[in-house]
Regions:
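Positively charged n-region of N-terminal signal peptides that target proteins for export
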Residues: 1-7
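Bacterial N-terminal signal peptides
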Residues: 9-16
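Sec-dependent signal peptide cleavage junction
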Residues: 17-28
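Asp-box/BNR beta-propeller blade signature and adjacent active/binding-site loops
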Residues: 26-447
């Protein structure tokens, strides 16, 4: 009798647990994308030993630790690729790697990097600064915020370090707008974008940097240099206050800015992460160099995601990488009982389209699943992937080849403990759109 009672009790308990999970699950309120998605996670037999096989290959940037993440990259004038990342999840000493062969292999990075980089508290972002006087050499700039991590104290503000010799040497970090300044901020992901500005239709030596804070206020600050070449940043100001209701509902953050006409035009497009995941990424436009922005609209499902990074390709198209966030019916059908938040991720995704697609609200041409990012104890590629990926370093080589780097769990056999936790590494992939165009066309002709 006691045995029967125990069985019934256990059955009731199990039912209660699963019923509770089902009741707590948020609904999938988004839509599905309808453009093709090219899956480069597994090499099909028909492309083995062909000119397309490279599209399915990954190069290891760094797998020397159990967890490395959040890379950013810049193309050097000699064709080398410099990639930077923190030694940890979102923070830690800045580490670097350099590829001298177009992303095929990665070797040692910067020698004798600044000692202040050891105390970096966030994901570093790196940009090239092209001056307009025809005399001043390009600078490279690394920026790293000082956010608040849990109970750890922070002085806030953001740090920047400058190189005027193509990354061989760097200044020590200089901090701007910490808690002791007249305009204190505690930024997150500074700068998620850095855009050279125009005045009277011509580029000037001013750059607009964007970041957000823990309350999802979004800020801009303008970078200039004094006559001695020292960086100055204007006092951060909120640039989206006019749309505070939707900014807050979306938990808008990690904004990428894209300039029209292959980076030469007069219109700016903003695309953001919606951290609430209860609405899609937001898109907004500015025709006055970021002084004002149009009413934000939700991006098409094909572009919905987090930490968008955009580059123009040699043929004028846009290649935008991001962490996929899927909120539609297909996502709901593929979700497991553990996916209770109204979304799932396909992992590391790239979108191929045009600036006009962004303006017109089109879905674009196609998406690319660049590799499968495994969940712990997931043994083979699946529609649902690990969402801990998608912060990318993207460069376009002179021959048009795209080299994109991200982080994630790429190998289901690379376990770091007995319970099946997988190693998180940084890898890169080479992409040529003329080749992915062919594969997508083959998909359409052979559904």
């Amino acid at each position: 009798m006691k045995k029967i009672f125990c069985i019934i009790t256990c059955a009731i308990l199990i039912f209660t647990i699963f019923a509770g999970c089902s009741a707590e699950r948020l609904s999938f309120t988004g839509s599905d994308y309808s453009i093709p998605e090219l899956d480069l996670s597994t090499l099909p037999n028909e492309y083995k030993n062909t000119e397309y096989e490279y599209l399915y290959e990954l190069s290891v940037v760094d797998n020397s630790k159990d967890y490395l993440a959040h890379p950013d990259s810049v193309l050097l004038k000699n064709g080398d690729i410099l990639t930077m990342f923190p030694e940890g999840h979102g923070k830690g000493a800045i580490k670097t790697k350099i590829s001298t062969d177009g992303g095929l292999t990665w070797g040692d990075g910067i020698k004798n990097s600044p000692s202040s980089w050891e105390n970096s508290r966030e994901t570093p972002t790196v940009y090239r600064l092209c001056f307009t006087d025809g005399v001043t050499d390009d600078n490279l700039i690394v920026i790293s915020a000082n956010p608040k991590w849990g109970d750890e104290p922070t002085d806030g503000g953001f740090n920047c370090s400058v190189s005027n010799d193509e990354g061989k040497t760097w200044t020590e970090f200089e901090t701007f707008y910490d808690i002791n300044s007249d305009t204190p901020v505690i930024p997150i992901v500074a700068m998620s974008s850095l855009t050279q500005l125009k005045e009277n239709g011509k580029f000037v030596d001013k750059w607009m940097g964007l970041f957000h804070d823990a309350e999802f206020y979004n800020y801009k600050t303008i970078l200039t240099f004094d006559k001695d070449g020292n960086p100055n940043w204007s006092a951060p100001e909120k640039y989206f206050s006019q749309y505070r209701e939707i900014e807050q509902k979306s938990n808008m953050c990690e904004v990428e800015v894209i300039r029209s006409e292959q980076g030469l035009g007069n219109r700016l497009c903003l695309i953001s992460r919606s951290n609430s995941k209860q609405m899609n990424s937001l898109i907004s436009f500015s025709d006055d160099e970021g002084k004002t922005w149009s009413y934000p609209v939700e991006a098409p499902a094909a572009l919905n995601g987090e930490r968008h990074k955009a580059e123009y390709t040699n043929d004028g198209r846009l290649f935008i990488t991001f962490r996929s966030i899927e909120r539609g019916k297909k996502a709901e059908e593929n979700a497991t009982r553990n996916d209770k938040n109204g979304w799932v991720s396909e992992g590391w995704i790239a979108w191929v389209g045009t600036f006009e697609d962004l303006e017109q609200g089109n879905e674009g041409q196609y998406r690319i699943k660049l590799a499968h990012i495994y969940k712990d104890r997931q043994r083979k590629p699946n529609y649902c992937a690990n969402a801990d990926t998608g912060y990318c370093g993207n460069v376009v080589l002179s021959d048009g080849t795209i080299v994109t780097s991200t982080y994630g769990k790429f190998d289901p056999k690379d376990r770091i403990d007995l319970i099946g936790t997988l190693k998180t590494s940084i890898c890169s992939k080479r992409i040529s759109l003329k080749d992915t165009d062919v594969l997508v066309e083959n998909m359409k002709n052979n559904p």
